[in-house]
Amino acid sequence: MLRTHDAGSLRESNAGQRVTLAGWVARRRDHGGVIFIDLRDASGVAQVVFREDAVLEQAHRLRAEFCVEVSGVVEVRPEGNANDEIATGQIEVNAAELKVLNESAPLPFQLDETAGEEARLRYRYLDLRREGPGNAIRLRSKANAAARSVLSGHEFVEVETPTLTRSTPEGARDFLVPARLQPGSFYALPQSPQLFKQLLMVAGMERYYQIARCYRDEDFRADRQPEFTQLDIEMSFVDQDDVIALAEEILVALWDLVGYRVPTPIDRITYAEAMRRYGSDKPDLRFGLELVECTDYFSETSFRVFQAPYVGAVVMPGGADQPRRTLDGWQEFAKQRGHKGLAYVLVGEDGTLGGPVAKNLSDAERDGLAAHVGANPGDCIFFSAGAAKSSRALLGSVRGEVAQRLGLIDPDAWAFTWVVDAPLFEPADDATAAGDVAVGSGAWTAVHHAFTSPKPESENTFDTDPGSALAYAYDIVCNGHEIGGGSIRIHRRDIQERVFQVMGISNEDAQEKFGFLLDAFAFGAPPHGGIAFGWDRVTALLAGTSSIREVIAFPKSGGGVDPLTDAPAPITAAQRKESGIDAKPEKAEKAGKPADA
């Protein structure tokens, strides 16, 4: 090793020892013929002082981010010069030798200053030298180790599943890779290890896990990445409670890393209750502001807007004094989410109701409205009316925005919940409208994925009454983020084929795309279930950052572009020809047999 000690490890107990450090010049300061540098390595920072003529002249050459090796004696800092803000603030190293290992070009941005995201991603290797970004990646490594420790303790087997497989419809678009030896044919990068982990259960592995790379070619909404990571888990001979218990053990180990003890068992809420009370299937429970049902209250209203299948409300405390411009902004807020607007009523300090909606209500409706929704003088009541699902979703968004604007969310709080009993299917048009891919050609598509088992009480009726069928599924939510989702899987061919039929996937298509799984079910497939944690989101929460890019070593920008390598990039004509990307495959050729040149 070039060094004897890590810079961040030095303490007063090291005083008098000769040490050799290696790292980067974080800062240089000249004081009356003496030069100080903050030497930074992965462990932290130590102050180095250059007093001796032999090294002083060399030290004058040092600039920010020069890579150096320094030898000297650890000394306690003079009285009054200690720095209590850093762990090594009681000592300094009196340098006797200095070696410049490599110089640095002028920096594109100062590492101790704020920089734009584009510059940070383009020079990510510099960005990661900073304490915050570097520590986020190190915390992710600790999270990996903590999860592996829990799973190893339960005798799970870590298995790597293929990253070159066939394209199967799973709810998003595949990234495709041309197969050079079979011109016109393509591999697909996996959207998840779902099918392979189920096959591992058929294979008798019983307990599997993998920190898996996954790929989805989708429109890049806020904070999405084309490649992402899951902690993927599958177990045989289990029910929902078994998987949840293991998942909670992992969560406890993870949050122990940041000094928080997750209380277990974690509360559960049904999907229906979550939507009714919070307008979201991933509710943030760090604050109240529950939705209020108003459908029955306005059942005989003459106000046409409220003559709807569903009417609901959410109260904004103190919101009655919002200026007109702000209230108009709420209309734009609703329109951005696909709604015509957001109705509101202002409760005056004397209890009278104001605003355009109040004028259209009957005296009886006005008199009892504040009490019905729990509004006080000075509050604003927001309403949404229409189809229950979309109206509740809008109110859920309003609820979150109100909490943000009013500072109702404790940034240091943690609130976990399981959301269970979600629908097994949703209308295909709803999935498409939400930006998802509706698998199959039927009127219904799977809410989670096509391999989720119906709950036992829905097993005999899910194909005759798809809208009422419940999934044997469970999602874990933390602070309004879905950080994991799982289900008990289908392990019988007949049930799987019935699910496919509901989704408009014919037996022929099912055999072509999923025949390997269906065939495996014929060989004593055991009951099994599992869960996958969104590892980027989990580690972002642990690191205290709102963006998953902060916990990915080399993330893509919002458009799926890598500013560092400038990927994706065009290929050459020679590469295109060699890959066979334009060739048309011969249908008669057998899989695994190369096409003729």
Swiss-Prot record:
Stated name of the protein: Aspartate--tRNA(Asp/Asn) ligase
EC number(s) given by UniProt: 6.1.1.23
Oligomeric form and interacting partners: Homodimer.
Site (Important for tRNA non-discrimination): H31, G80
Subcellular location: Cytoplasm
Principal cellular location given in the protein's record: cytoplasm
Residue stretches of biased makeup (Basic and acidic residues): 575-597
GO CC terms of this entry: cytoplasm
Catalytic activity, reaction form: tRNA(Asx) + L-aspartate + ATP = L-aspartyl-tRNA(Asx) + AMP + diphosphate
Sample GO molecular function, one term: aspartate-tRNA ligase activity
Similarity-based family: Belongs to the class-II aminoacyl-tRNA synthetase family. Type 1 subfamily.
Residues that hold L-aspartate according to the record: E170, R216, H448, R489
Keywords of the record: Aminoacyl-tRNA synthetase, ATP-binding, Cytoplasm, Ligase, Nucleotide-binding, Protein biosynthesis
Segments for region (Aspartate): 194-197
Lineage: superkingdom: Bacteria
Species for this entry: Mycobacteroides abscessus (strain ATCC 19977 / DSM 44196 / CCUG 20993 / CIP 104536 / JCM 13569 / NCTC 13031 / TMC 1543 / L948) (Mycobacterium abscessus)
The encoding gene: aspS
